[in-house]
Design a protein with these regions (language model features):
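Catalytic core of pol beta-like nucleotidyltransferases
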Residues: 1-21, 29-35, 46-100
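Short, well-ordered beta-strand segments
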Residues: 40-42
Length: 100
């Protein structure tokens, strides 16, 4: 199985100026996934506008994998506390913007 961080769509996401961090969570982060398990991503983009998030979703929708990708936006208050806690418990940081 290909390393999640090596997918081209992850590289494209990292190039977006408003993306601060990309986290893998869920079964793939825990290592108890099946071959066809989905990819769960949490993307922190504190300063992104809704139109910026649409760019993220376009990249995800056109990803270089046939696996299903579930993507949640961090930095919005819409996540339930339970989901956020599960993300924090499982998270593997795939990318973190270098702060100057």
């Amino acid at each position: 199985m290909k390393d999640i961080a090596s997918y081209k769509f992850i590289e494209r996401l990292k190039q977006l100026s408003f993306v601060d961090e990309i986290w893998l969570f869920g079964s793939r982060a825990r290592g108890d996934n099946q071959e066809r398990s989905d990819i769960d991503l949490a993307i922190l983009c504190k300063d992104a506008k809704d139109s910026d998030w649409l760019r993220v979703m376009d990249i995800v929708d056109n990803a270089d994998t046939l696996l299903k990708i579930d993507c949640v936006r961090l930095g919005k208050k819409s996540l339930s506390k339970g989901l956020y806690n599960n993300i924090l418990k499982d998270k593997v940081v795939l990318y973190a913007k270098v702060k100057n």
